[in-house]
Amino acid sequence: MTNSEPRRMTCDSEVVWKKLQDGLDVAYRRENMAPKDYMTLYTSVYDYCTSITLSTSRRDGEDGRAESSTPARTAGADFVGHEMYQRVEEYVKAYVIAVCEKGAELSGEDLLKYYTTEWENFRISSKVMDGIFAYLNRHWIRRELDEGHENIYMVYTLALVVWKRNLFNDLKDKVIDAMLELIRSERTGSMINSRYISGVVECLVELGVDDSETDAKKDAETKKLAVYKEFFEVKFLEATRGFYTQEAANFLSNGGNVTDYMIKVETRLNQEDDRCQLYLNSSTKTPLATCCESVLISNQLDFLQRHFGGLLVDKRDDDLSRMFKLCDRVPNGLDELRKSLENHIAKEGHQALERVAMEAATDAKLYVKTLLEVHERYQSLVNRSFKNEPGFMQSLDKAATSFINNNAVTKRAPPQAQLTKSAELLARYCDQLLRKSSKMPDEAELEELQTKIMVVFKYIDDKDVFSKFYTKMFSKRLISELSASDEAEANFITKLKSMCGYEYTARLSKMVNDTQVSKDLTADFKEKKADMLGQKSVEFNVLVLSSGSWPTFPTTPITLPQQLSKTIEIFGQFYNEKFNGRRLTWVYSQSRGEITSTAFPKKYVFTATTAQMCTMLLFNEQDSYTVEQIAAATKMDEKSAPAIVGSLIKNLVLKADTELQKEDEVPMTATVSLNKAYMNKKVRVDLSKFTMKQDAVRDTENVQKNVEEDRKSVISACIVRIMKTRKRVQHQQLMTEVITQLSGRFKPKVEMIKRCIGSLIEKEYMLRTEGQKDLYEYLA
C-alpha cells in the first residue's frame, strides 16, 4: 500500500496580487470582464489562500504534529489573509482619494452630478470586487468577525467604509448644501434633476456603517440610516422649517385670506409628501410631515381658529372641511374648533326658535320641524366636512341638548311648565303624526318622520315627561280607534324601546295588548249574550283596560239613559261570569258613541262623549232645560254640567236663551234648547273634539303637577335598588350612581336626591353609619 503525498502549491504573493490588481483596474474602469477572467481572479484568491495553508500544514506534519482533516488556523494563513485584506483596502483607498481630489474643485449641481455618477460606478465596481474576494469573505474575514476583531469588514462593506472616510467626510458639507439648495430651487418653482438628490440619498443610506462595531453586531435598520439622518435629514428638516416659516409670514403679512392660505398649505403638504416618495428615504416622511404641520398649521392655529366662526356663518362647507383636515393633523388642533361649533349651533338653534316662538308655542309640527332643520343642517356638516369625528359629534349633541330643552318657545310657557314644554310638544307632534287624518303620510314617509322624531327625542332631558304625555295621547288614540296604522304605532314603540329599554315602553305594550284582548272579549260577549241583548240593542264595543297600565282617568258619575244602561248591565254580568273576582269600573269620561238625529232640517250622525249623549237624549223628552236640571237628570256635578252644555252650544247643537260671556262658562241657571236651525255640510259630525281640547289642557296641568312627585318615587326606588345591591355605599358614590342610572329618563336634581335619601332614612330603609356620616348602610 503506497501513501499519496498532499498536493503542494506555492504562490508568489506579488505575482498573485499583480494579477488581482489588474483585474480590479478593469472592474473600476467599468470595462467588460469576461466570465473566464472573473473566474481566473476568483481562483487566484482561492489558490493563494489555500496554498499557504497547505504548505504550512505539510511542514507541521513532518515535525511530528497531529494532522487534521480540516485546514488548521496557522500563523501563515493569518498573515496571508491579513496581507490580502490590507492590499484590498489600500487599493480602494487610492482609488477613492483620486475621485475625491477631482470632486473637490466642483460645487452646486455640478458636484451633485459628479458625486452621484462616481458613487454609482464605485458601488457597482465594489460589488464585482466583493465577488472576486468571496473566498476571503467566507474564511479569513468571517473568522475575524466571529472572534470579535474590530475594524474588519466584508470586502464590499470595507469599500463603503473607505468611501465614507476618504471621500464623503471631506465633501459632505458641500454635497449636503448643494442638495438643500437644489430642493429649495424646486420649492420656489424651478425644475430640477431629482436623480442628483436621490443618488446621494441612496449613497448616504448605504454608508450606514458604524466604524466602531462589527457588521454582525449591528441593528441593521437603525444603523443603516445613521449617516443619512445625521448628515442630511437633520439639516434638511431645519432648512424646511426655515423656508416655510418665512413663506407663511410673507403670505399673512400681505393680507392673504384664510381660504387661500389653507389651499396653499394643502398644496405644500402634498408636494412634500411627493418629494419624500420621489427622492428621499421613506423614514423621512413622518418627521417631514410633522415639521411642515408644525410651521404651517400649529404656528398658525390662532389665525385658522379665528376664521372658523365666519366660515360657519357663511356656510362654506368645503373650506370648513379643509380647515378640519388641516387642524386634525396637529395635537389639540381641533379643541377650539369643537367649542366654536358647539356655541355656533346653540346660537343658531336659539335664533331659529326665536323667529317662530309665537306660532310654535301652540304648533307642535312647526316646533319639531324647526328643531330638525337646525339639527339636520349641522348633522350634515359634521358628516361631510368633519367626517363624523367624535369630538364634533359631541359638540353637536351638547348644542342640540341646549336649544331643544330650553329655548324661546319653552320660555313662553308658564314657569311651572317650561321644563316640560319641549317634551310635551314633541309628544303632541307624535300624536298628530300617528292619528287618523285626511292627509296621512304613506308608510315610507311615516317611517322617515318617526326616525326624525327619534333624533329630537334623543336630546330631550325629561324623557319621563315625554312618556307621560305620549302615554296619555296614545291611550286616547287606542280608545277612540284613531290610530293611523297599528303597524306605525308598533314601529314607534320599538324605536322607543331600542333607545330607552324595555321598562320605558312596557306600559305601551300592555295597552296594545289590552285592546287586542278587548276585541276578542267583545266578540265573545256579542255571541254569548245575543239573546239577552235583543235586536234593538245598541251597537256596543268595549275596552277593558288594566288599571296599572293605563293613565288614570276621571271617573265622573253619570246616569245613563236606559238604552245604554241595559247593555252595560248585561256585559257586567258576562264579565263576572268569565272572570270571577275582578271588578269593573266604568270610565265614562273616555267613552264615545254615535247618535243619529232627525231633529234638524236634515239627518245627522253625531259622535259624542257619554256626557254629551246623555245630555242630548234628554231633549227627546222636552224642548228646553236649565243647566241645573240637566245636571240633576244626569247626575253630573256643577263643574262638569256647564262644560258639557257649553261644548254643545259651541258646536251650535244647543242654544242658550241669553247671550253668554263665554260658551264654556254657562251658568247653572241658564236655559238651553235644541237649535233646530242647526246646519252642517257634513252628515257625520264629531262633537267630542271640543272636549278633547279641554282634556289636553287638563292633561298638561296634571302632568306638570305630578312630575315632581313621580320623580321622587323613581329616585327613591333607584336608591333602594342600589343600597340593596351594595349594602354599604359612600354618599358621593350613591349620588353618582343615581344620576347615571336615571339620566336616560330625566336629570335628577341633587337636592331632590338628598331629600329622597333623608326620607328613606326616616322610613328606616337605610341609615348613616355611626362615626362616618358620608357612609350609608342598607336595612333589610
UniProtKB/Swiss-Prot annotation:
It is found in: Cytoplasm. PROSITE patterns: CULLIN_1 (PS01256), CULLIN_2 (PS50069). GO terms for molecular function: protein-macromolecule adaptor activity; ubiquitin protein ligase binding. Keywords: Cell cycle, Cell division, Cytoplasm, Isopeptide bond, Ubl conjugation, Ubl conjugation pathway. Residues 710-771 form the Cullin neddylation domain. GO terms for biological process: cell division; determination of adult lifespan; embryo development ending in birth or egg hatching; negative regulation of apoptotic process; negative regulation of cell population proliferation; negative regulation of centrosome duplication; negative regulation of DNA damage response, signal transduction by p53 class mediator; negative regulation of mitotic cell cycle. Neddylated; which enhances the ubiquitination activity of SCF. Pfam families: Cullin, Cullin_Nedd8. SUPFAM superfamilies: Cullin homology domain (SSF75632), Cullin repeat-like (SSF74788), Winged helix' DNA-binding domain (SSF46785). Pathway: Protein modification; protein ubiquitination. Component of an SCF (SKP1-CUL1-F-box protein) E3 ubiquitin ligase complex composed of cul-1, fsn-1, rpm-1 and skr-1. Interacts with Skp1-related proteins skr-1, skr-2, skr-3, skr-4, skr-7, skr-8, skr-9 and skr-10. Probable core component of multiple cullin-RING-based SCF (SKP1-CUL1-F-box) E3 ubiquitin-protein ligase complexes which mediate the ubiquitination and subsequent proteasomal degradation of target proteins. As a scaffold protein may contribute to catalysis through positioning of the substrate and the ubiquitin-conjugating enzyme. Required for developmentally programmed transitions from the G1 phase of the cell cycle to the G0 phase or the apoptotic pathway. This is Cullin-1. It comes from Caenorhabditis elegans. The gene is cul-1.
